[in-house]
A protein has these predicted regions:
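A short, sequence-level motif marking secondary-structure junctions
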Residues: 19-25, 57-63, 122-128, 160-165
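Generic marker of residues within folded, mature protein domains
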Residues: 36, 98-100, 138
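Structured core of small recognition/catalytic domains
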Residues: 109-185
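Intrinsic disorder/low-complexity detector
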Residues: 1-15, 42, 49-52, 57-119, ...
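A cross-kingdom feature marking solvent-exposed beta-strand/loop segments within repeated
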Residues: 15-55, 127-132, 142, 147-155, ...
Length: 185
């Protein structure tokens, strides 16, 4: 099993790394179990015999781990939803989301400071209590890390502290009391 690692910065730059040695992959995959600490302030260091690269985690939007191996055991399921990054093909087709009954399927576009945009599909079970649904909506930006699946296989880790805003389609009917009601111009 090989693993491709992509570090996407808030400046909308992507640095790619590859590792095919199973012994070197194991500690990388094991570190996913501590993913909630990834953006806690300590630098992200990726090194090889040729060079060592150090990233300020405050400037990292996402880190993606592309592989044909199953990484789902290392992926905590936040809230009651599964996020999946949209493929380039999915971005060309109009999105048909639904929020009905106990289930929902929405598109969430995450906009990061500096210009990077991550387009995702979110699917899950709606919380029965309004207060829990509102907490899900507002707690995105308060989490230490958010996980998402890659369409080509693998997982990504999103830095919520680098998100400037996110857009849900279709819109959410259950808004907080202090939300402003207005249409986009």
């Amino acid at each position: 099993m090989a693993i491709n690692i992509t570090v996407i910065t808030t400046a909308n730059r992507a640095r790619r790394f590859v590792q095919a040695d199973g012994a070197a992959i194991e500690p990388i995959v094991d570190s996913l179990n501590r993913s909630s600490q990834l953006f806690a302030g300590k630098p992200l260091i990726i090194g090889s015999a040729a060079h060592t690269e150090v990233f300020s985690t405050a400037s990292v939007a996402c880190v993606e781990f592309e592989t044909d191996g199953d990484l789902s055991d290392h992926m905590a399921s936040p809230m009651n939803l599964v996020l999946t990054a949209l493929s380039p093909q999915e971005l060309t087709v109009p999105f048909e989301g639904v929020i009905e009954g106990e289930h929902f399927k929405v598109r969430i576009d995450f906009f990061f400071t500096g210009g990077y945009v991550l387009h995702t599909r979110a699917e899950g079970v709606r919380k029965a209590v309004l207060a829990e649904r509102l907490m899900n909506l507002t707690s995105f930006l308060e989490r230490p890390v958010m996980n998402y699946r890659l369409p080509q296989g693998g997982i990504g880790l999103m830095n919520p502290h680098a998100i400037s805003r996110f857009l849900l389609t279709p819109g959410v009917a259950d808004l907080p009391r202090d939300a402003w009601l207005a249409e986009p111009a």
